[in-house]
Amino acid sequence: MTVIERFLKFVSFDTTSSETSGQQPSTPNQKVLGGELVRQMLALGICDAHMDDAGYVYGTIPANCAKYLPVYGLIAHMDTSPDAPGGPIHARITEAYDGGDIVLNEAQGIVLSPRDYASLQKHVGKRLIVTDGTTLLGADDKAGVAEILSAAEKLLTSDRPHGTVKIAFTPDEEIGEGADRFDVTGFGADYAYTVDGGAIGELEYENFNAASASVEITGLSIHPGSAYGKMVNASLVAMEFAALLPALETPYFTDGYEGFFHLTGMEGEVEHAKLSYIIRDHDREKFEARKAVMEKAAQEMDRRYGKGTVTLNVRDSYFNMREKIEPCMFLVEQAKSAMLELGIMPKVQPIRGGTDGARLSFEGLPCPNLCAGGENFHGRFEYVPVEDMEKITELLATIIWNIAK
């Protein structure tokens, strides 16, 4: 199978993860896809390919040379984001892109346009895999899954020397649980790369420090005709709480190394309201300061409306892996070198998000992130260029081959 054939097969599985199921993996189709991956790995000759009870898929490509080499891992995730419908996905491949609009769904008037997504202009002349405008595509991260398996095929069918390579495919990365039950010791790699980035050339070893915050607000209901000086409307208190946070420090207004507060959910009535936030910043001190701002806002609401009005729960999710990667920057340099060898321009940049590798780096497995090729993740305008997936497959194999030189 080609990398494109693999990818189109994998996106036919709806593997949307769920934050509310309480299961592991969070949705059953992730294990269905995992079974398919194990079958393909066994067919390639990866004899120890298996899936554990939690839905993690593992396998080993043995070294084909006597030289002592560190063991490297390649990791991608099987789930897709719950932010957009995950199926049924009707993917199609365009002809060579001409730089104009791409009609995704004529009946619904859904168009992928360079006026809205300027990155399309980089791909003139390439074939693009797109959706029908009703679902996401799943290049995040099934492009990475397909590229790893296709690179594995290259390694297994070539006489070029390489060391031992470990492969892992994780569930539930999109809901922040991809590393929860990852068996770092059993995986047995010294170093690894996640293949979970965006456009070709992206190479990342910095990510957000991340936390989630739940704001529970208790109000007091009374008949509005006699509510003077008595009613505490929890929904209005929620609005006041939100107004105390910096208005220009949301995802819409921030970029690069700038952090943010992101309101991800809200519900409310008079007696009870709830706000759900995620907090992000690359700088650890600024990250801690953001959490302190949330605490101060909660205290102010209690001052205005009485102690116990607001219950704030903040939970750290993951931290910036930079401090774990900097002692082994050769991981970044050897990826850059392989890119340049293949005519890919490296783009080293911070991740405005997180990866499984961020958490794994803190568990003793340094794990920077490589491009998977897709763009516009988590939405119906997601796409991935065919030629870039083919080149990234070559990149993964080249990194492994170069380590053995």
Each model region followed by its residue ranges:
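N-terminal capping segment at the start of a domain
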Residues: T2-P28, V130, Y318, H378-G379
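A non-catalytic alpha/beta surface segment that caps or lines the substrate-entry region
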Residues: G22-L69, G73-I75, D79, I89-H90
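Active-site metal-coordination/substrate-binding segment of hydrolases
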Residues: K67-P161, F169, A189, K391
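Midchain, well-structured core segments that form catalytic/ion-binding scaffolds
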Residues: I102, Y117, K126-A139, D172-E295, ...
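Short glycine/serine- and small hydrophobic-enriched flexible loop segments
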Residues: L149-L156, E240-A247, T398-W401
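Phosphate-handling active-site elements
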Residues: E153-K166, A247-T254, K405
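Active-site-adjacent substrate-binding region
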Residues: L236-F253, F260-H262, T309, F319-P368
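Zn-dependent metallopeptidase/amidohydrolase metal-coordination segment
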Residues: E269-E271, P346-I403
